[in-house]
C-alpha cells in the first residue's frame, strides 16, 4: 500500500473506538495495512452488510472488543490492558432523526462516552495522542452562506447536533484542565485535538436516513429513490478524505505535541457543497439506472438546510486539502456498492484507498 505517512504508523498501538461503524472500519483497514497494531472498541455493527462485517477487518486487527463507551470503568480496563499510544475516538450515536427518539441515550453516548474516553486517557501511562471525532453539526448553525471556522460558537438545534457541540465543549475543558499544552511533559503527556468533518459518504455504509444508503437500497430493490430533503445543501466528502486528515493530524501531534492540540475542520472543496438532489442524480448516473422521487414533507422534523465548513486552517497549518470533487466522491462510492456482491471486500477497500492516493 502507498504510505503517505512515511512508516509512522508501523508498529504503533492505535485504539479506535467505533471501529465496527462506517468511518471506523475504513480507518481500521487503513491503519492495519500501514502496520499499526489496531485495538478496536465498539458495539455490534449495524447490519450484516456493513463494511466492517464484509471486509473481515475484525479478524485481522490486534483486538476486536465489544464494549460500550458509556461504561467508564470498562474503558479504563481496556486502556490499561492494551496500552494504546494513539486514540481515535469515533464511537457515537450518529443520526439526527434518531436523536429525537432517543435524546437521553444520544447525550449519554456522545457526551459522557467522550468524557469516559478522555478519563481513560488521563489515567493511562501510554497514550500520547488523542483525536476526538465530532461533526460539522457541532457549530451553532445560522445557515450562513460562508463556512464555519474552528473558533466559532458550538451549538446545535436537535439532540444529536447539540450533543456533539456539548462534546466539543467537554473536550476543550479537559484540554485546558487536564491536558493543557503549557503543562505538557510536567503534569501530563497527552496531546488532545478534536476534528469536525462534513457529510461523509463511501462504500459499506447502510445507516438509516443517509442519502447514499437510501439510494443503493432503492436501486437494489428496483424501486424509485425517495428524497426527503432535496434542496438541503451539505458538504459532501468521501470517507477517505477526512480519515487522511485525522491520520495526518495525529502524526503531527505526535511529533509536536503542543502545536496542534486544538479543533480542526476537515471539510470538502467548496464545489462539493451541493444539494441532496444533485448527489442522488450522480448516484443514478454512476450506478447506470434509477429514478428519483421528491417526497419532501414541510412538517418533517427539523434538520439544517445549509451547513458549510471553512478548511483554511487545515490547508495552511497541516498541508491537508481535499483530493476529490463531488463527482469523484460519488463515483468511488458507487463503485464499491456495484462490486461488493462479487469481490473480496477487504481487497476492494485496499484498492480504493490506493486509487484515492494515486489518482489525486
For each predicted feature, which ranges?
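Short aromatic-enriched loop/helix-cap "lid" or pocket-rim segments at secondary-structure transitions
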Residues: 50-53, 142-145, 205-209, 239-240, ...
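A short C-terminal helix-loop "cap" of Rossmann-like NAD(P)-dependent dehydrogenase/epimerase domains
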Residues: 58-59, 151-153, 177-192, 215-227, ...
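Amphipathic alpha-helical segments in well-structured domains
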Residues: 114, 208-213, 246, 280
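Short, solvent-exposed loop/helix junctions and linker helices
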Residues: 17, 108-111, 160, 164, ...
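N-terminal Rossmann-like NAD(P)+-binding domain of SDR-like oxidoreductases, especially those catalyzing
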Residues: 1-197, 201, 340, 356-357
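Residues in well-ordered alpha-helical elements
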Residues: 72-73, 85, 97, 104, ...
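C-terminal substrate-binding subdomain of Rossmann-fold SDR/epimerase-dehydratase oxidoreductases
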Residues: 31-37, 67, 199, 219-360
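Generic structural signal for small/hydrophobic residues in well-ordered secondary structure
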Residues: 9, 19-21, 87, 117, ...
Amino acid at each position: 500500500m502507498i504510505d503517505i505517512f512515511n512508516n509512522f504508523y508501523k508498529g504503533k498501538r492505535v485504539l479506535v473506538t467505533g471501529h465496527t461503524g462506517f468511518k471506523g472500519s475504513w480507518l481500521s483497514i487503513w491503519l492495519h495495512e500501514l502496520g499499526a497494531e489496531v485495538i478496536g472498541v465498539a458495539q455490534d455493527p449495524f447490519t450484516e452488510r456493513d463494511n466492517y462485517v464484509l471486509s473481515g477487518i475484525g479478524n485481522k486487527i490486534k483486538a476486536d472488543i465489544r464494549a460500550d463507551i458509556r461504561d467508564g470503568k470498562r474503558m479504563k480496563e481496556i486502556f490499561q490492558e492494551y496500552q494504546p499510544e494513539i486514540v481515535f475516538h469515533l464511537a457515537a450515536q450518529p443520526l439526527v432523526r434518531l436523536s429525537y427518539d432517543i435524546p437521553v441515550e444520544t447525550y449519554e453516548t456522545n457526551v459522557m462516552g467522550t468524557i469516559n474516553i478522555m478519563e481513560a486517557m488521563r489515567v493511562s501511562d501510554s497514550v500520547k495522542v488523542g483525536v476526538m471525532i465530532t461533526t460539522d453539526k457541532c457549530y451553532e448553525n445560522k445557515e450562513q452562506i460562508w463556512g464555519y471556522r474552528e473558533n466559532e460558537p458550538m451549538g446545535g438545534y436537535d439532540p444529536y447536533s447539540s450533543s456533539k457541540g456539548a462534546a466539543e465543549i467537554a473536550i476543550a475543558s479537559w484540554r485546558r484542565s487536564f491536558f493543557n499544552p503549557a503543562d505538557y511533559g510536567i503534569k501530563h503527556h497527552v496531546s488532545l485535538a478534536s476534528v469536525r468533518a462534513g457529510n461523509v459518504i463511501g462504500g459499506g455504509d447502510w445507516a438509516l436516513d443517509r442519502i447514499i444508503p437510501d439510494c443503493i437500497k432503492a436501486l437494489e430493490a428496483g424501486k424509485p429513490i425517495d428524497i426527503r430533503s432535496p434542496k438541503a445543501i451539505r458538504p459532501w466528502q468521501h470517507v477517505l478524505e477526512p480519515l487522511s486528515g485525522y491520520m495526518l493530524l495525529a502524526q503531527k501531534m505526535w511529533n509536536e505535541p503542543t502545536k496542534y492540540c486544538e479543533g480542526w475542520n476537515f471539510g470538502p472543496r467548496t464545489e462539493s457543497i451541493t444539494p441532496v438532489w444533485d448527489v442522488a442524480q450522480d448516484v443514478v448516473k454512476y450506478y447506470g439506472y434509477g429514478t428519483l422521487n421528491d417526497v419532501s414533507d414541510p412538517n418533517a422534523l427539523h434538520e439544517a438546510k445549509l451547513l458549510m465548513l471553512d478548511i483554511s486552517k487545515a490547508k495552511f497549518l497541516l498541508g491537508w486539502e481535499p483530493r476529490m470533487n463531488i463527482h469523484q466522491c460519488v463515483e468511488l462510492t458507487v463503485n464499491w456498492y456495484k462490486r461488493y456482491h462479487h469481490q473480496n471486500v477487504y481487497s476492494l477497500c485496499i484498492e480504493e484507498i490506493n486509487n484515492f492516493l494515486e489518482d489525486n
